[in-house]
UniProtKB/Swiss-Prot annotation:
Ca(2+) 1 binds at D345, D347, S349, N351, E356. Ca(2+) 3 binds at D417, D419, D421, H423, E428. This is Calcium-dependent protein kinase 27. Keywords: ATP-binding, Calcium, Kinase, Lipoprotein, Membrane, Metal-binding, Myristate, Nucleotide-binding, Phosphoprotein, Repeat, Serine/threonine-protein kinase, Transferase. InterPro entries: CDPK_Ser/Thr_kinases, EF-hand-dom_pair, EF_Hand_1_Ca_BS, EF_hand_dom, Kinase-like_dom_sf, Prot_kinase_dom, Protein_kinase_ATP_BS, Ser/Thr_kinase_AS. It is a lipid-anchor. The active site is at D156 (proton acceptor). Activated by calcium. Autophosphorylation may play an important role in the regulation of the kinase activity. GO terms for cellular component: plasma membrane. It catalyses: L-seryl-[protein] + ATP = O-phospho-L-seryl-[protein] + ADP + H(+); L-threonyl-[protein] + ATP = O-phospho-L-threonyl-[protein] + ADP + H(+).
């Protein structure tokens, strides 16, 4: 939701929802964890009186740092109530509050994420066609249309926020998260940064936007569904946001010549950089390619599905390498990072909260915005518990600075170059990825292809070093922390 973290709001006597406190465990049996974020976690739960299964999103009060954040929670609940019952939108059940948390109980969607459904077709060798893509985007744009009609701008449309109601072939796609959503105020120009990389609209980056930004995000999803990758690249650092604002998308490259011209026309209309000229949700649903039965059921080349799989596996090898480097830093090298961690962790809890990170960075001379610090927090918080521990801190700071030292990168290269022949081969890369439970053959081939500038089918040290020093634009630009030598 963008504004959770800190210990400032301890268990308050007044209630956030302005109704009596309730022990949720007397109403529901809380079960397995479904997901975790900076604000808390979502669990499967069973209603004791009926035996029905729901999902329970628990927001810890200690993560709400001010009244603005409390208002964000109340707004999310109001929006879910207002939209409940609309097609393709998760059903709101109820909201409760106890002394520690706010609990939002909603419909349980047991079919997994949207991309998982598509990739399952790839895994079992089934076909995937424009017809499937049109059906998926129809559900997504139907959400946008209903949100806008009901006076809500979603602001964070991405595949991860869409789940399937079941594992059945005819399962319904539903949007589940309204943490970034706002009520649309007539004539208001929105300026705050909201959304996710890849899917964020250019006008959002420019700080001047309205509900049309949701159509752009849906258009990016459609683009990816039809070609298997994003139109924008994250590397080198900062390039993606610049491309979102200005890059002319090339539809002459494969596989676009194989796509229906009407599909391409729709993507172009949804990705018009002028929000005033961009197609509306109702117009998308009425587009010739989108009409029921119009999109081709001819199987799309398997390369698109394999690209989708690689798109999800992006940067996994880098994470494997970073984990190795962090684990092998000497005590002397870690000493400086530990000192910095201790200075920022002012309450000496062993964990850095968002508020401590903001205060610490300001004290160190950083002028990052609130959103940029939140992005940094999210990137460093690997286990998603809302705080940064010492290991996460070392990995995050080492990621940006220790990679400038050849000895660290070379030591990692040697670790993955099992036969010490000066190259990381496909087999060696496969071994490294499988040890970490990441990557398939297509992803591994793509990692090599992306890094292998001399096209010999292997990764030498120079290529490895270049790959590891190429940053992701997920991190805010500029120096975040002082360099530790």
């Amino acid at each position: 939701m963008g504004c959770f973290s800190s210990k400032e709001l301890q268990q308050s006597k007044r209630t956030i929802l302005e109704k009596p406190l309730v022990d949720i465990t007397k109403i529901y049996i809380l079960g397995e964890e479904l997901g975790r974020g900076n604000f808390g976690l979502t669990r499967k739960c069973v209603e004791k009186s009926t035996g029905k299964t729901f999902a329970c999103k628990t927001i810890l009060k200690t993560k709400l740092k001010d009244e603005e954040c409390e208002e964000d929670v109340k707004r999310e609940i109001r929006i879910m109530k207002q939209l409940s019952g609309e097609p393709n939108i998760v059903e709101f059940k109820n909201a409760y509050e106890d002394k520690d948390s706010v609990h939002i109980v909603m419909e349980y969607c047991g079919g997994g994420e949207l991309y998982d459904k598509i990739l399952a077709l790839y895994d079992v060798g089934k076909s995937y066609s424009e017809k499937e893509a049109a059906g998926i985007i129809r559900s997504i744009v139907n959400v946008v249309k209903n949100c806008h009609y009901m006076g809500v701008m979603h602001r964070d449309l991405k595949p991860e926020n869409f789940l399937l109601t079941s594992n059945d072939d005819n399962a319904t796609v539903k949007v589940i998260d309204f943490g970034c959503s706002v009520f649309i105020e007539e004539g208001k120009v929105y300026q705050d940064l909201a959304g996710s990389d890849y899917y964020i609209a250019p006008e959002v980056l420019q700080g001047n936007y309205g509900k049309e930004a949701d159509i752009w995000s849906a258009g990016i999803i459609l683009y990816i569904l039809l070609c298997g990758k994003s139109p924008f690249v994250k590397e080198p650092e900062g390039q993606m946001f610049n491309e979102i604002k200005s890059l002319e998308i090339d539809y002459s490259e494969e596989p676009w010549p194989l796509r229906d011209s009407r599909a391409i026309h729709l993507v172009k209309r949804m990705l018009d950089r002028n929000p005033k000229e961009r197609i509306s949700a109702a117009e998308v649903l009425g587009h010739p390619w989108m009409k029921e039965g119009e999109a081709s059921d001819k199987p799309i080349d398997g390369v698109v599905l394999s690209r989708l799989k690689r798109f999800r596996d992006a940067n996994k090898f880098k994470k494997v390498v970073l984990k190795f480097i962090a684990a092998n830093l000497s005590e002397e090298e870690i000493k400086g990072l530990k000192t910095l961690f201790t200075n920022i962790d002012t309450d000496k809890s062993g964990n850095i909260t968002l508020e401590e990170l903001k205060t610490g960075l300001t004290r160190l001379g950083s002028n990052l915005s609130k959103t940029e610090v939140e992005q940094l927090m999210e990137a460093a918080d690997m286990d998603g518990n809302g705080t940064i521990d010492i290991d996460e801190f070392i990995s995050a700071t080492m990621h940006r600075y220790k990679l400038d030292r050849d000895e660290h990168v070379y030591k990692a290269f040697q670790h993955f170059d099992k036969d010490n022949d000066g190259h990381i081969t496909k087999e060696e890369l496969e071994m490294a990825m499988k040890e970490d439970g990441a990557g398939d053959e297509g992803s591994i081939k793509q990692i090599i292809a992306d890094a292998d500038t001399d096209n010999d089918g292997k990764i030498n040290f120079e290529e490895f070093r270049t790959m590891m020093r190429t940053e992701s634009s997920l991190q805010p630009e500029g120096e975040l922390l002082p360099i530790i030598n």
